[in-house]
């Protein structure tokens, strides 16, 4: 979940630059519901409509990434459309990378990785990356692998979770432009029980929300995480 002063404008901006499907809650056709999210396959980028506060940099979620074949051109388009280029282009493991910030303060990495196009990765910040990756593996699965044999991470098939080491403490994500992550469960009651057995801290126990059930936990480094059960 990201934040923006106008959810529809944010949805349009992301679709314009990164594609995806603009839609409503659960892809509803109810026109009384706002268009507040972009679907990239089964992955949703959802926007809260509020002041974005501080940006993602400096929090436990530094940025997320998209894989595209035209990194320089897309960076230029983004800068012309209210975004900001953060650093010069770099080469990493033979791939060109650019970093931008969207108009609401969330950092985005653009990488040319032909093996996985579209939504590509979540990149967290932590003083202890190995412990953070292990926590996510223990509680949310994923295959422990090195991306391109270089960066340790968790592979979820349609997205990677990567963690970089930082020396300073990181800020909690809640209230910033990248407010929280989310994971889907088929049985939230069982997930609640299993996560509690792993000493995961629940900041909101499971409850009904519209036609789904949700809960919130706090991950390492102040990362807020939503748990969702859908029919």
Specify the residue positions occupied by each region the protein language model found.
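N-terminal, post-signal-peptide region of Sec/Tat-exported proteins
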Residues: 5-49
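Eukaryotic phosphotyrosine signaling hubs
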Residues: 60-63, 177-180
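Vicinal oxygen chelate
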Residues: 2, 23-26, 66, 75-124, ...
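Post-signal peptide N-terminal segment of secreted/secretory-pathway proteins
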Residues: 53-56, 64, 69
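Amphipathic alpha-helical segments
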Residues: 6-22, 77-81, 128-144
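Amphipathic N-proximal alpha-helical interface segments
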Residues: 48-51, 109-111, 166
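Helix N-cap motif at beta-to-alpha junctions
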Residues: 6-7, 68-72, 128-129, 185-189
